[in-house]
C-alpha cells in the first residue's frame, strides 16, 4: 500500500497564450491565485523576468513548493507542484492553473513522494523480529 508524504505534479502546458505567459506581471496573480485556491500556505515567493520575454517563479510553501517556467515563443509553461499532506491541495492548485492558463494540451506526471515509507517500516519490523 502506498502511503507517501506528498504528491508531486510535474506538468507541461502547451498552446498557452504567449502574451499571458510573457511576463511576471501577468503570471504573478495566476500563480498566487493557485496557491490560494489550493489552500496552500505561502512562506515566500520569488519571480524572475527574462528579456525580452519569459518568466520563472517559485513559491515556497509550508507544504513544499510550486514553481514554473515559461517559454512564450513556444506557448509553453512547465510546472512543478509538490505538496505534503492532503493530496487534494495539489490537485486543486493544478486545476486552477489549467483553468487560468487554458492550455490546448497537457503532459502530466503525478508522483507519490516517499511511497516506500510503509515498506521500509515493515522491513525494519521484520529485521527486529529476527534479532
Swiss-Prot record:
GO BP, sorted A to Z: spermidine biosynthetic process
Catalytic reactions on record: S-adenosyl-L-methionine + H(+) = S-adenosyl 3-(methylsulfanyl)propylamine + CO2
GO MF, any single term: adenosylmethionine decarboxylase activity
Pathway(s) it belongs to: Amine and polyamine biosynthesis; S-adenosylmethioninamine biosynthesis; S-adenosylmethioninamine from S-adenosyl-L-methionine: step 1/1
GO cellular component terms, A-Z: cytosol
Site (Cleavage (non-hydrolytic)) residue list: 63-64
Cofactor(s) required, per the database record: pyruvate
One Pfam assignment: AdoMet_dc
Highest rank taxon of the organism: Archaea
Free-text comment on the cofactor: Binds 1 pyruvoyl group covalently per subunit.
Record-linked NCBIfam families: SAM_DCase_Bsu (TIGR03330)
Function comment: Catalyzes the decarboxylation of S-adenosylmethionine to S-adenosylmethioninamine (dcAdoMet), the propylamine donor required for the synthesis of the polyamines spermine and spermidine from the diamine putrescine.
Name of protein: S-adenosylmethionine decarboxylase proenzyme
Organism for this UniProt entry: Thermoplasma acidophilum (strain ATCC 25905 / DSM 1728 / JCM 9062 / NBRC 15155 / AMRC-C165)
Lineage: Archaea, Methanobacteriati, Thermoplasmatota, Thermoplasmata, Thermoplasmatales
Gene encoding the protein: speH
Amino acid at each position: 500500500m502506498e502511503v507517501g508524504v506528498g504528491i508531486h505534479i510535474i506538468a507541461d502546458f502547451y498552446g498557452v497564450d504567449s502574451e499571458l505567459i510573457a511576463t511576471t506581471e501577468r503570471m504573478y496573480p495566476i500563480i498566487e491565485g493557485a496557491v490560494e485556491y489550493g489552500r496552500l500556505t505561502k512562506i515566500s515567493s520569488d519571480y524572475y523576468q527574462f528579456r525580452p520575454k519569459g518568466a520563472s517563479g517559485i513559491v515556497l510553501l509550508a507544504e513544499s513548493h510550486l514553481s514554473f517556467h515559461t517559454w512564450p515563443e513556444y506557448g509553453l509553461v512547465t510546472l512543478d507542484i509538490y505538496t505534503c499532506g492532503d493530496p487534494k491541495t495539489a490537485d486543486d492548485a493544478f486545476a486552477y492553473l489549467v483553468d487560468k492558463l487554458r492550455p490546448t494540451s497537457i503532459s502530466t506526471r503525478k508522483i507519490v513522494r516517499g511511497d516506500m515509507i510503509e515498506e521500509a517500516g515493515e522491513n525494519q519490523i521484520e529485521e527486529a523480529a529476527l534479532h
